[in-house]
Design a protein with these regions (language model features):
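Active-site beta->alpha loop and helix N-cap motifs at the rims of alpha/beta catalytic domains
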Residues: 1-64, 74
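Catalytic alpha/beta core domains of metabolic enzymes, predominantly
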Residues: 48-49, 60-169
């Protein structure tokens, strides 16, 4: 329920509930993406708006390095219905700390396509990316290889995907 204001995000969350959505997710406020306290107020308001499970779409700006797993989890524990997060950040150390410290209680999803396989190795429950639909075979191969215990093949699939990504982002 990305919106330019908390009020709009609340309206969208309520609309999602009325249409039968299974859950809602939200990014931090667009005008203060690195202010975690402001984000918590925003997330709490959305969480209070419905009884739907709530996911945080974690997408820090490139300059944000102050977040710790402890701070993230302690803050979001106060958000009603918080059940998981989509982690769109290249900081796999922080992602793994979040997975570890949440004790498997949260649904942890990775975002960057470039680190999908590494995310699986760090404990990701799933992935939401932007290029899976243009090269599904590669990502299915990656997932199936990882699930069958063949990490080498999963990493080879990641290399294939990253070659395509390098061309797309050129």
């Amino acid at each position: 329920v990305g919106a330019t204001s908390t009020e709009n995000a609340i309206d969208l969350a309520k609309h999602a509930k009325s249409t039968g959505a299974d859950a809602v997710s939200s990014i931090a406020p667009i005008d203060a993406p690195d202010d975690f306290e402001t984000a918590l107020t925003h997330y709490s308001a959305i969480g209070e708006a419905t009884d739907l499970p709530f996911y945080v779409y974690w997408f820090p700006s490139s300059g944000s390095t102050a977040m710790t797993a402890e701070r993230f989890l302690e803050g979001l524990a106060k958000v009603r219905n918080f059940v998981g997060f989509k982690f769109t950040d290249m900081n796999l150390y922080l992602f793994n700390r979040l997975v570890d410290q949440s004790g498997g209680e949260l649904n942890a999803i990775t975002g960057p396509d470039e680190i999908c396989a590494a995310g699986m190795m760090m404990g990701s429950d799933g992935a939401v990316g932007s290029t899976y639909n243009i090269m599904p075979r590669i990502f299915i191969e990656m997932y199936e290889s990882f699930q069958s215990g063949n990490v080498k093949e999963a990493m080879e699939a990641q290399v294939k995907a990253n070659r395509v990504l390098a061309l797309l982002f050129k």
